[in-house]
């Protein structure tokens, strides 16, 4: 495995630009322009990302999110919707054929998520891998009851007890692995569930109550307010420990920024975000 990676931090960027950078990095890494990359980012304004195959018109209350000023963006990765507000988001981009990268999605997911797990441990939070054990848990993954990502933990996601602490997804494209994930520092459950369509308010309240037992934010686990920078530094250390890595900073050149801006237009478009 390549032991020297690059690290990139891009704070307070719009949703379309955040997704464009992740997609652009697939090309940059695939062409050998940059080394395998660990990226940390945040969102301004807050945004709602939906999974690549998710039916946004079926799940998302468009009128409500527009009234709240929450833009939507469709990810390259699968899974369900995530409201990105007070959080740290991470992404990892590396060649699929790089030595040491498992061939299966589940095992590579476990390898990369180990860096996040160790990062939580550096913050004093004993998170562990979640593996669905019961038939009920496995059925819940096959047929989700909710459009909300944090409603259930998949294989090798991170949890404290039965409560999910981070939501991640992975895709392989053009010979490159992209895994990105949301690490909420706090969650506004009222606003989160306002984003989705339900048959009635009773169902909305029922799903909100269910969510409280299925997910937990970092500040609640830490018992204090944890900053983006503190989490970022802990996760860098976590990846250094988990994969025996060193990091050097990544800065894009003007040509790379032009490619990112071109991709961002797709992520701002009605066609990409809603008509799929």
Curated annotation (Swiss-Prot):
> Looking at its record, which EC class is this enzyme?
transferase
What is the catalytic activity of this protein? octanoyl-[ACP] + L-lysyl-[protein] = N(6)-octanoyl-L-lysyl-[protein] + holo-[ACP] + H(+)
Q: Which UniProt keywords apply?
A: Acyltransferase, Transferase
Catalytic center at which residues?
A: 149
* EC assignment: 2.3.1.181
Q: Name one GO biological process term.
A: lipoate biosynthetic process
The keyword Acyltransferase is annotated on this UniProt entry: yes
> InterPro entries recorded for this chain?
aa-tRNA-synth_II/BPL/LPL, BPL_LPL_catalytic, LipM, Octanoyltrans_LipM/LipL
Quote the pathway field: Protein modification; protein lipoylation via endogenous pathway; protein N(6)-(lipoyl)lysine from octanoyl-[acyl-carrier-protein]
* Database matches in Pfam families: LplA-B_cat (PF21948)
Residues under site feature: Lowers pKa of active site Cys: 164
Location of the BPL/LPL catalytic domain: 32-247
Query: Which GO molecular-function terms appear in the entry?
Result: lipoyl(octanoyl) transferase activity
Q: Which family does it belong to?
A: Belongs to the octanoyltransferase LipM family.
> How does this protein assemble?
Monomer.
Instruction: Give the protein's biological function.
Output: Catalyzes the transfer of endogenously produced octanoic acid from octanoyl-acyl-carrier-protein onto the lipoyl domain of GcvH, an intermediate carrier during protein lipoylation.
Further comment: In the reaction, the free carboxyl group of octanoic acid is attached via an amide linkage to the epsilon-amino group of a specific lysine residue of lipoyl domains of lipoate-dependent enzymes. The reaction proceeds via an octanoyl-thioester enzyme intermediate.
Q: Can you name this protein?
A: Octanoyltransferase LipM
- Species of origin: Exiguobacterium sibiricum (strain DSM 17290 / CCUG 55495 / CIP 109462 / JCM 13490 / 255-15)
